[in-house]
Regions:
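AMP-forming adenylation/ATP pyrophosphatase catalytic core
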Residues: 46-146
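Catalytic subdomain that performs nucleotidyl-dependent activation
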Residues: 1-48
């Protein structure tokens, strides 16, 4: 459908053969959705809008948690988590991104969170995190000598 809209606008649509390759989840899912006559498209649009609202609320809460519970020190950040898990994951993601320069995978941040809750040290990217008495400390990992 999008290709038709783009073509009608006078733009040549890109053709990515992997979009039709069943080895990829996205191709299989698109085929399944296309054949699902029971799918209520307007209800999906409402659900998507609700998810966008929830995402905005989580972002707002994470920004507030950051300003109230995160301090920057000479070696990294200390985070004194007060918010629910979903918010804390976003705060940890921001800390890792700020220190490491790249956005970590969600599953890696979730593992980091679980380790810190269990008061176990953990690493993510080039960083090390520890549960300290005054909060969670996230710093650059020491340089390894060869």
């Amino acid at each position: 459908e999008l290709a038709k809209v783009v073509a009608a606008a006078g733009i040549e649509p890109a053709d990515d053969p992997s979009n039709r390759d069943d080895r990829f989840d996205r191709a299989r899912i698109r085929k399944a959705i296309a054949g699902a006559d029971w799918l209520d498209v307007p209800a999906l649009a409402v659900s998507a809008a609700n998810l966008a609202d929830a995402d905005a609320a989580l972002e707002w809460a994470a920004a507030r948690e950051w300003s109230e519970c995160v301090t920057k020190g000479p070696m990294g950040y200390t985070y004194r988590p007060q918010a629910p898990r979903a918010v804390a994951l976003r705060v940890l993601t921001r800390i890792v991104t700020e220190l490491d320069g790249s956005v970590p995978r969600g599953s890696a941040v979730a593992r980091l969170f679980e380790s810190l809750v269990a008061r176990q040290p953990a690493s993510i990217g080039g960083l090390v995190a520890r549960a300290m008495p005054d909060g969670w400390s996230v710093t650059k990992a020491p340089v390894r000598r060869a």
